[in-house]
Design a protein with these regions (language model features):
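Conserved glycine-rich cofactor-binding loop
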Residues: 9, 14-18
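Conserved NAD(P)H cofactor-binding loop of Rossmann-fold oxidoreductase domains
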Residues: 88-94, 253
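Substrate-binding pocket helix/loop in short-chain dehydrogenase/reductase
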Residues: 96-98, 104-109, 213
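Alpha-helical segment proximal to the catalytic Tyr-Lys
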Residues: 125, 169-170, 241
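Catalytic loop of short-chain dehydrogenase/reductase
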Residues: 136-159, 164-173, 184-186
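Short C-terminal tail/terminal secondary-structure segment
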Residues: 145, 233, 244-259
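Short, small/polar-rich loop/turn modules that mediate ligand/substrate recognition or access, typified
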Residues: 172, 177, 243-245
Length: 259
């Protein structure tokens, strides 16, 4: 299937590793010119070269911290006419409600709400004017299945979800869609960090902690980053123009709800 992405310009945030990198690779395979982003120049340039070698398409590394006004401005300046925006950033460390103070809430909104919201604000008008745009926010399964220890992440990502639902109803008339991908149990560096953290808390080997978590997944395996990334790429296609304002779970069937 031709997704009609070839030649499109795509910004993928926090894409030197993990799910961001997987999404950048998938989009590049379809012929998009991808602008990848991260804070560490050497790592980012190596990722750009790796993806470009594999796909044969140009990949532009933009070293910038998207949690700052200067970083966001630099990223937008590198690709002011982006057709595709994939919002992504690392999540906060799990913890306890009673330990989260005012500073913790401010920090998580500056990490998982404001960068995406302000990048959308910068790029959405141009997308609407050109009559094409695809915005995908990588959020979290915690949006639909909140857990106490992930309360900080849930608060910020749910706020982003609500904002994007509101603005998506206006943007879609100009062929601009905004959707959210909700990963859970995808085999990424973030997931490995959480496994190692749990192993330490439970005083068990890392592999035992990994198996314990695997047993909770309906599919009895972790998701592959490329599976997640290919869904992201489909949402950026011409064919996905009637999918808008949705929260799409990628969790191996583990979500217990029906809506």
């Amino acid at each position: 299937m031709d997704l009609h992405i070839a030649g499109r310009k795509a910004i993928v945030c926090a894409s030197s590793q993990g799910l961001g990198k997987a999404c950048a690779l998938s989009l590049s395979r379809e012929g998009a010119k991808v602008f990848i982003n991260g804070r560490h120049e050497d790592k980012l340039r190596a990722t750009a070269e790796e993806i470009s070698r594999e796909t044969g398409h140009a990949v532009v590394p933009v070293v910038a911290d998207i949690m700052t006004d200067e970083g966001r401005a630099k990223l937008v300046a590198a690709c002011p006419d982006a057709d595709i925006l994939v919002n992504n950033n690392a999540g906060p460390t799990p913890g306890k409600f009673e330990d989260w103070d005012h500073a913790a809430y401010i920090a998580v909104f500056e990490q998982n709400f404001l960068p995406a919201a302000l990048l959308i604000r910068a790029l959405l008008p141009g997308m609407r004017q050109r009559q094409f745009g695809r915005i995908v926010n990588i959020t979290s399964a915690m949006v639909k299945s909140p857990r106490a220890h992930q309360g900080l992440s849930t608060a910020a990502r749910t706020a982003l979800t609500a904002l994007c639902k509101a603005i998506s109803t206006e943007a879609v008339v100009d062929n601009v869609t905004i959707n959210n991908l909700l990963p859970e149990r995808i085999d990424s560096p973030r997931q490995q960090y959480l496994i190692e953290r749990q192993a330490k808390m439970d005083n068990i080997p890392v592999e035992a902690a990994r198996q314990k978590l695997t047993d909770t997944i309906a599919a009895k395996r972790f998701g592959r980053p490329e599976e997640f990334a290919d869904m992201c790429t489909y949402l950026c296609s011409e064919q996905a123009s009637f999918i808008c304002g949705q929260n799409i779970q990628l969790d191996g069937g583990s979500y217990r709800g029906i809506v």
